[in-house]
């Protein structure tokens, strides 16, 4: 299993970096759309759609929805402050606040949505669509002036999330004693959680110094810590839905890593939340 995880990581990391820095806006949008379609395919299982045909239709409908939104906003990469994009990012904040309540009060909260495929599908839309626009909004930042400025921001969020996750794992292994959310994800501890946030703060400081980002350090730190918190919530939320669905992994598309959602669950929360804070709340970019 470890061998497959390492092989997948060595293949995926260069591919992700290449997609960030080499693809034009249209190419990046298409790749992100495909990733979202695969995520929708896996979310179908979390929503109670177990047959292959049902999940294929969900993936296709997701792709059509995102393609329609792109069609309605052909110049999004020149002006990311468009109503549809902003509504999607604000919706992500609302959804993740609701998700926090669902996780905090689980398993009691499951009584609200456990038997409703419609609600679980809505949760999926609120997870995938803002993630899609968060990715595109950050990548499109000042693209005409500097093709790589948006890629640097997106790479930062990814490093932040992966670094916080690694920090949480190490601190949890070394010092973990008190469970964070035992009914949702028994392996997570408060010590790991705090270690992850501390790691995120260090990354915020270090990356800000290296990349010379045109953002006040305090603003970057606030956005980064909130995004790191959101990444933990994204992980816990998917774990909650998987627990209700009775599955360990969301899929088997990535050898050694499970499914697409298993790899991007933290990013589905962190990316739109970070984008919303930076673009709309602080209006920094």
Swiss-Prot record:
<comment type="pathway">
    <text>Phospholipid metabolism; CDP-diacylglycerol biosynthesis; CDP-diacylglycerol from sn-glycerol 3-phosphate: step 3/3.</text>
</comment>
<feature type="transmembrane region" description="Helical">
    <location>
        <begin position="56"/>
        <end position="76"/>
    </location>
</feature>
<feature type="transmembrane region" description="Helical">
    <location>
        <begin position="213"/>
        <end position="233"/>
    </location>
</feature>
<feature type="transmembrane region" description="Helical">
    <location>
        <begin position="93"/>
        <end position="113"/>
    </location>
</feature>
<comment type="similarity">
    <text>Belongs to the CDS family.</text>
</comment>
<keyword id="KW-0808">Transferase</keyword>
<feature type="transmembrane region" description="Helical">
    <location>
        <begin position="151"/>
        <end position="171"/>
    </location>
</feature>
<dbReference type="GO" id="GO:0005886">
    <property type="term" value="C:plasma membrane"/>
</dbReference>
<dbReference type="GO" id="GO:0004605">
    <property type="term" value="F:phosphatidate cytidylyltransferase activity"/>
</dbReference>
<keyword id="KW-0443">Lipid metabolism</keyword>
<keyword id="KW-0997">Cell inner membrane</keyword>
<feature type="transmembrane region" description="Helical">
    <location>
        <begin position="264"/>
        <end position="284"/>
    </location>
</feature>
<feature type="transmembrane region" description="Helical">
    <location>
        <begin position="31"/>
        <end position="51"/>
    </location>
</feature>
<keyword id="KW-1208">Phospholipid metabolism</keyword>
<dbReference type="Pfam" id="PF01148">
    <property type="entry name" value="CTP_transf_1"/>
</dbReference>
<keyword id="KW-0472">Membrane</keyword>
<keyword id="KW-0548">Nucleotidyltransferase</keyword>
<keyword id="KW-0594">Phospholipid biosynthesis</keyword>
<keyword id="KW-0812">Transmembrane</keyword>
<keyword id="KW-1133">Transmembrane helix</keyword>
<feature type="transmembrane region" description="Helical">
    <location>
        <begin position="121"/>
        <end position="141"/>
    </location>
</feature>
<dbReference type="InterPro" id="IPR000374">
    <property type="entry name" value="PC_trans"/>
</dbReference>
<dbReference type="GO" id="GO:0016024">
    <property type="term" value="P:CDP-diacylglycerol biosynthetic process"/>
</dbReference>
<keyword id="KW-0444">Lipid biosynthesis</keyword>
<protein>
    <recommendedName>
        <fullName>Phosphatidate cytidylyltransferase</fullName>
        <ecNumber>2.7.7.41</ecNumber>
    </recommendedName>
</protein>
<keyword id="KW-1003">Cell membrane</keyword>
<feature type="transmembrane region" description="Helical">
    <location>
        <begin position="190"/>
        <end position="210"/>
    </location>
</feature>
């Amino acid at each position: 299993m470890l061998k497959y995880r390492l092989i997948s990581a060595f293949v995926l990391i260069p591919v992700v970096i290449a997609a960030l820095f080499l693809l034009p806006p249209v190419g990046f949008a298409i790749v992100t759309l495909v990733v979202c379609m695969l995520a929708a395919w896996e979310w179908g299982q979390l929503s109670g759609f177990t047959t292959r045909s049902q999940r294929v239709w969900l993936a296709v409908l997701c792709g059509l929805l995102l393609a329609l939104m792109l069609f309605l906003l052909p110049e999004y990469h020149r002006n990311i402050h468009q109503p549809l994009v902003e509504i999607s990012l604000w919706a992500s904040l609302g959804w993740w606040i609701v998700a926090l309540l669902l996780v905090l009060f689980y398993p009691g909260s499951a009584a609200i949505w456990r038997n409703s495929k419609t609600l679980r599908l809505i949760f999926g839309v609120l997870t995938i669509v803002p993630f899609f626009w968060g990715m595109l909004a950050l990548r499109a930042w000042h693209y005409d002036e500097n093709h790589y400025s948006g890629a640097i921001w997106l790479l930062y969020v990814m490093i932040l999330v992966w670094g916080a996750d690694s920090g949480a794992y190490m601190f949890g292994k070394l010092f973990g004693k008190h469970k964070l959310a035992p009914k949702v994800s028994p392996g997570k501890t408060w010590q790991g959680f705090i270690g992850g946030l501390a790691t995120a703060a260090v990354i915020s400081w270090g990356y800000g110094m290296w990349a010379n980002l045109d953002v006040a350090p305090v603003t970057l730190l606030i956005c980064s810590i909130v995004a790191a918190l959101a990444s933990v919530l994204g992980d816990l939320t998917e774990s909650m839905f998987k627990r209700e669905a009775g599955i360990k992994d969301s899929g088997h598309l990535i050898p050694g890593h499970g499914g697409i959602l298993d790899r991007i669950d933290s990013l589905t929360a962190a990316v739109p939340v970070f984008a919303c804070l930076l673009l709309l709340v602080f209006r920094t970019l």
